């Protein structure tokens, strides 16, 4: 008679073993000795996470597309005594993503943590008023397809290694419909990312974890174009009455990336000032 196994993933024997990690909780939050790869990390949320990871001891691979980030990688190395290097890649190009991930693995020897953070907002207004489908294709290609390419090729490395933590930057927009701005495309893409993560958490259960962080409105350059009267409406809708600072997201990412979360997979952490509560 065959030994019992998990229904979805075929893991056996049961129960599966508990990971051997430090009993000291502060040591479990440390990223010392780990390698983190972060897309869209030349500025905003991505760089805030990259800096937090460096502070926690991780070596960091910074990804950029249009803004060269060698100086930022050098800053992380000199300031925090870690290894950091910048890589140019268009995450909408599957071959570039595959090559970049393989290069990072070669340069650093492994990849412990991957953050799929690159993304763009929808700014075209109500969907049916847009004269063509180019804007839709652009947002979905970056926010969903680009995240998928990263997961596919990072996941292959995680499977080969037998370990890894993958984190998607999703959004509260995957949970609710934003107002007053109309952004059906962005909402749909981020909702898809949430379910992609949960699906991969099951597929990868034997070798890696997969989770999401869902930021609310953050004070970054991605929202610089938003008129003040729109932001005032946001503040009224946010129970805490303000946008978040990117640094306020760092703790969620560090938890999911670290050994403090070895039994956390398929989860989403909302960091939205309470927006989704009412």
Swiss-Prot record:
Main EC class the enzyme belongs to: oxidoreductase
Pfam families xref list: adh_short_C2
Cystine crosslinks: none
Similarity comment: family membership: Belongs to the short-chain dehydrogenases/reductases (SDR) family.
This protein's name: Probable NADP-dependent mannitol dehydrogenase
Listed EC numbers: 1.1.1.138
Key words, A-Z: NADP, Oxidoreductase
PANTHER family registered for this protein in UniProt: BENZIL REDUCTASE, L-XYLULOSE REDUCTASE-RELATED
Record GO terms (molecular function): mannitol 2-dehydrogenase (NADP+) activity; NADP binding; oxidoreductase activity, acting on NAD(P)H, oxygen as acceptor
Catalytic activity: D-mannitol + NADP(+) = D-fructose + NADPH + H(+)
Single biological process term from Gene Ontology: protein homotetramerization
Subunit structure: Homotetramer.
Oxidoreductase as UniProt keyword: yes
């Amino acid at each position: 008679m065959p030994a019992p196994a998990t229904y979805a993933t075929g893991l056996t024997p049961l129960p599966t073993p508990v990971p051997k990690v430090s009993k000291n909780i502060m040591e479990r939050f440390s990223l010392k000795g780990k390698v983190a790869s972060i897309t869209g990390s030349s500025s905003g949320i991505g760089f805030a996470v990259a800096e937090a990871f460096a502070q926690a001891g991780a070596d960091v691979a910074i990804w950029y597309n249009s803004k060269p980030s060698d100086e930022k990688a050098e800053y992380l190395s000199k300031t925090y005594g870690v290894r950091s290097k910048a890589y140019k890649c268009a995450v909408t190009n599957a071959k570039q993503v595959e090559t970049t991930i393989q290069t990072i693995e070669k340069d650093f020897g492994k990849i412990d943590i991957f953050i799929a953070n690159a993304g763009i907002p929808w700014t075209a207004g109500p969907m049916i008023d847009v004269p063509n489908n180019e804007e839709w294709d652009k947002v979905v290609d970056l926010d969903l397809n680009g995240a998928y390419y990263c997961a596919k090729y990072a996941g292959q490395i995680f499977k080969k290694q037998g370990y890894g933590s993958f984190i998607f930057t999703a959004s509260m927009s995957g949970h609710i419909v934003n107002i007053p701005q109309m952004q059906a495309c962005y909402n749909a893409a981020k909702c898809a990312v949430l379910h992609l993560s949960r699906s991969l958490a099951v597929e990868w259960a034997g070798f890696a974890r997969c989770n999401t962080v869902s930021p609310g409105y953050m004070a970054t350059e991605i929202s610089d174009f938003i008129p003040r009267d729109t932001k005032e409406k946001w503040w009224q809708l946010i129970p805490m009455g303000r946008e978040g600072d990117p640094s306020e997201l760092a703790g969620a990412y560090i938890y999911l990336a670290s050994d403090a979360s070895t039994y956390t997979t398929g989860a989403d952490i909302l960091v939205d000032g309470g927006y989704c509560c009412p």
